[in-house]
């Protein structure tokens, strides 16, 4: 049986392009660029294209018709050749870009002098009309621009400063006579301590901003990728002023920290003055981020956000998407430290029983800058000095309870935020609060608390038939008893009416039943991802008591690392099997479990196979992996 061409086309499109996300907003990581820094470029799956395109003439033509995006760097073969798989008539989007020719830091240093003379690429950017002569069906033109600013230049220059001169004099003239949309993506790299004040107010940049605003939305800075930001920089205001003048719609920031093999590496504090490794890492407050005009998307990489930054987020009506991390353990650590329970019935009493944590807090030399706003001794999450240098804590620690509450309230009343991704910054490798509370939890799992009391039936452990698995209690399950953290977070979820996609990652155990129950009241979330954010018991509660009462969530993703009892035939826990059989509102369900225990205690009973379970469900697409 021969498939029709439209089906072959869809199959090939999936096989070739789906894996590589070959779209206009895709950003790959070029490890050869600028000492492992990030670079904006397209990933063209050439090997896949040739593997399928050279099978026969028919497949050649189908694959060729699927290639609608190309760039100056993708192919060097003649565009007019009928034997070229990239046919100019099929191209609707073109990426005009230049890539640096060096690969190492030494090569970068050797080329610095040439940057002061002429554009070292030897090629200028082409205008719309020039590209239309080659690609007559062009609909969108993307310019990848490099703005790199070094601290050791006597005269600061852009690598691509000529782009702005050409843009102002030539490019905008073409936009009025064509239907081609222009998107500009900028990589802005600033070496620490570089002075960019004069650049941020440069006439060419200001004229560029004015031209953008007057282009009737035919031209926009679609994305700005900032690399090199550091809290020790004295020119952060100038950097954000420059970003404001460039008017980006999306902003991605990578903090300037060295991370090798998943661990923070030692760096000297410029104020330590001891010549050794006595300094500590620092993070930026990002307070200026929300002040950027017309920003629609914010993403922070390799750093965390302080809660006070997002207080007032409801006033930023342009912002649609936020992807950030929080230092939840630091926030909870200071909530515990600042709050003094009145009696043992207080919900924080569980934390007070954790002797290791209390001892750590009492023995630590807490010192504050500006009287109360900065905890600068050592990080609760990276405090093993023999292994790693500590990282600075959150800012405004004395206000962390109030800041968290106000931030959650601001998000809850936002009417324009559509996409929210929140993840835990701590990797738990050297986390003292994790070790302390986990130690307390393990004692509970043996039936004994730190004060010697027998907890008996109060132990929150997993059980299945006659088998009891007591060491699966998660350390964070102690922390989720803190109402200062969980109550505002619950209200944020239940009261918000605009968020359609919510992604929670790395919050394992922090989501108690109160937080999970807030999804019952929420009526806006359509796509929910709970990755590494549920314990075994919370998974059962969520699937049994929450999801049956929510009708708006259509796409659900769950990734679980806890030990999990699974039926040997269905390969999933009973609560999930029942949910799959009874749910009538979900469209897609994706579950991934890393640590499963197969239960075969009911061999005599009638078994439901995985295949029959999936076939009997009304959920359109189900993907379960263990």
Curated annotation (Swiss-Prot):
Write down the PANTHER family for this protein, in alphabetical order: CCZ1_INTU_HSP4 FIRST LONGIN DOMAIN-CONTAINING PROTEIN-RELATED (PTHR32423:SF24), SAP DOMAIN-CONTAINING PROTEIN-RELATED (PTHR32423)
Q: What's the protein called, per UniProt?
A: Putative uncharacterized protein DDB_G0275003
Source species: Dictyostelium discoideum
């Amino acid at each position: 049986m021969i498939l029709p061409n439209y089906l072959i086309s869809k199959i090939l499109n999936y096989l070739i392009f789906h894996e590589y996300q070959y779209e206009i907003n895709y950003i790959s990581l070029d490890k050869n660029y600028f000492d492992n820094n990030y670079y904006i470029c397209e990933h063209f799956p050439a090997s896949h294209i040739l593997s399928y395109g050279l099978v026969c003439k028919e497949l050649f033509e189908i694959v060729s018709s699927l290639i609608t995006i190309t760039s100056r760097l993708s192919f060097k073969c003649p565009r007019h050749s009928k034997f070229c798989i990239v046919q100019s008539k099929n191209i609707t989007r073109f990426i005009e870009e230049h890539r640096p020719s060096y690969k190492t830091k030494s090569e970068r240093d050797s080329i610095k002098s040439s940057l002061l003379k002429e554009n070292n690429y030897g090629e200028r950017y082409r205008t719309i009309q020039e590209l239309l002569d080659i690609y007559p069906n062009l609909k969108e033109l993307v310019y990848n621009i490099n703005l790199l600013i070094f601290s050791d230049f006597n005269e600061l220059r852009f690598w691509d400063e000529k782009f702005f001169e050409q843009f102002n004099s030539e490019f905008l003239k073409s936009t009025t006579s064509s239907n081609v949309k222009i998107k500009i993506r900028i990589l802005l790299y600033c070496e620490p301590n570089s002075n960019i004040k004069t650049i941020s107010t440069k006439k060419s940049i200001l004229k560029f901003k004015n031209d953008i605003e007057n282009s009737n939305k035919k031209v926009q800075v679609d994305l700005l990728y900032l690399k090199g930001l550091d809290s020790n920089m004295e020119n952060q205001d100038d950097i954000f002023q420059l970003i404001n003048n460039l008017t980006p719609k999306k902003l991605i920031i990578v903090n300037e920290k060295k991370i090798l093999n998943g661990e923070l590496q030692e760096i000297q504090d410029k104020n330590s003055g001891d010549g050794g490794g006595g300094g500590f890492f620092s993070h930026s407050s990002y307070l200026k981020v929300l002040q950027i005009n017309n920003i629609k998307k914010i993403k922070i990489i390799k750093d965390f956000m302080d809660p006070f930054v997002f207080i007032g987020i409801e006033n930023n009506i342009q912002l649609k998407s936020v992807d950030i991390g929080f230092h939840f353990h630091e926030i909870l650590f200071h909530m515990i430290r600042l709050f003094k329970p009145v009696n043992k019935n207080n919900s924080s009493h569980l934390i007070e029983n954790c002797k290791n944590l209390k001892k750590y807090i009492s023995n630590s030399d807490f010192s504050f800058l500006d009287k109360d706003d900065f905890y600068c001794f050592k990080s609760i999450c990276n405090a093993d000095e023999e292994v790693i240098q500590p990282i600075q804590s959150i800012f405004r620690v004395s206000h962390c309870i109030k800041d968290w509450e106000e931030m959650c309230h601001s998000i809850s009343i936002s009417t324009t935020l559509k996409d929210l991704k929140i993840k835990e910054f701590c990797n738990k490798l050297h986390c003292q609060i994790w070790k302390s509370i986990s130690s307390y939890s393990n004692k509970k799992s043996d039936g004994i608390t730190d004060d010697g009391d027998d907890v008996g039936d109060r132990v929150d452990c997993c059980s299945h038939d006659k088998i009891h698995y007591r060491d699966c209690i998660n350390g964070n399950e102690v922390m989720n008893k803190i109402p200062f953290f969980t109550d505002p977070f619950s209200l944020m979820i239940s009261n918000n009416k605009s968020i359609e996609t919510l992604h929670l990652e790395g919050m394992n155990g922090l989501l108690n039943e109160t937080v999970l129950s807030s999804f019952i009241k929420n009526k806006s979330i359509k796509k929910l991802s709970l990755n590494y954010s549920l314990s075994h018991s919370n998974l059962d509660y969520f699937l049994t008591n929450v999801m049956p009462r929510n009708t708006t969530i259509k796409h659900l993703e769950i990734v679980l690392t806890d030990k999990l009892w699974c039926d040997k035939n269905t390969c999933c826990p009973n609560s999930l099997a029942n949910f799959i059989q009874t749910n009538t509102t979900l469209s897609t369900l994706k579950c991934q479990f890393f640590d499963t225990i197969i239960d075969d205690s009911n061999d005599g009973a009638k078994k439901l196979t995985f295949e029959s379970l999936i076939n009997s469900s009304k959920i359109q697409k189900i993907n379960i992996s263990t």
